[in-house]
Structure formats: structure tokens, C-alpha cells
Amino acid sequence: MDIDLLWSFGGWFFILFPETINYCMAKLRSTSQISHFTNPRSCSSLFFVALLIITILITMLQSSTSMEVTSLPTHQPTSSNSHDESSTSSTATTTTDLHPKRTHHQSHPKPTRSFEAGAHEVPSGPNPISNR
């Protein structure tokens, strides 16, 4: 097992649990090569930094979802029940054009011009230039 590969994929268990080093294929000459967290402040500071990063990520995700919810049109309740269902359904199905300057293209455009294939001279023979 390659030790560099373990470090790149989170080999922190070697630092936290030094007895797991015995399960590696390569044996270390001494245990002094491994740095241990002897200072409890460094462990707690790493914990708080990780907690801060997770908190920031969660707030960013919540703010992006709340922006999506507020950008959706809301249905206003009508004050009177005299409106028919078609008028309320037409207001509920309105959409917002996100790109107002873009023109809408048809998926299959109608052919507006026809190719003018009138009568024309067709050369005959293997070499049309010499047939003139």
C-alpha cells in the first residue's frame, strides 16, 4: 500500500491512531518520523475550522434555495369568488421570459425561398470543355 496515496485520500488515521501503521506493507525505521498532535489546542482549532467551513457551506446553500423560492411568482388570493376558473388559471400559469432580447426560433423553419432550378445546358461526354 502506497503511503502517499493514503495521505492524499485522508491518511489522518495514521496520526490519530499510530497502531494502524503496523498494517502497512512498508515498515518505518522509527516512530519519531510521525508527527503527533501533542497540543490539544491544535486539535480543537482544526475542529473549529472544519465546523466554520461546514456552517458557511450550509448557509450558502440555504440562501441560494431561498432566493429561488422568492423569485417564483406567488398566487394572490382573490377577494371575491365571482371570477371564473379560466381567469385564475391564466394568471397562475404566467411565465417569466429570462432572455427578453432573444428571438424565439422555430425548430423547423418553413422554406421561404425555393431553389430556382430552371433549364440549363448540360455538357455531355467525358470532357465537357472539348465538346464545345
Swiss-Prot record:
Keywords: Cell membrane, Developmental protein, Differentiation, Glycoprotein, Hydroxylation, Membrane, Secreted, Signal, Transmembrane, Transmembrane helix
Residues annotated as signal peptide: 1-26
Hydroxyproline modifications at: P123, P126
Molecular functions (GO terms): receptor serine/threonine kinase binding
Residues that span the membrane, as ranges: 42-62
Keyword Glycoprotein among record annotations: yes
Extent of Basic residues compositional bias: 101-111
Result after altering G125A: Impaired repression of tracheary element differentiation
Outcome reported for the amino acid change (mutating S130A): No visible effect on tracheary element differentiation
Sequence ranges of Low complexity compositional bias: 87-96
Reported impact of P126A: No visible effect on tracheary element differentiation
Sites carrying sugar chains: P126
Lineage top rank: taxon: Eukaryota
Effect seen on changing N131A: Impaired repression of tracheary element differentiation
InterPro entries named among the record's database cross-references: CLE41/42/44
Gene Ontology CC: one annotated term: apoplast
Polar residues bias locations: 68-77
Effect ascribed to mutating P128A: Impaired repression of tracheary element differentiation
Family to which the UniProt record says this protein belongs: Belongs to the CLV3/ESR signal peptide family.
Name of the protein in question: CLAVATA3/ESR (CLE)-related protein TDIF
Natural source organism: Zinnia elegans (Garden zinnia)
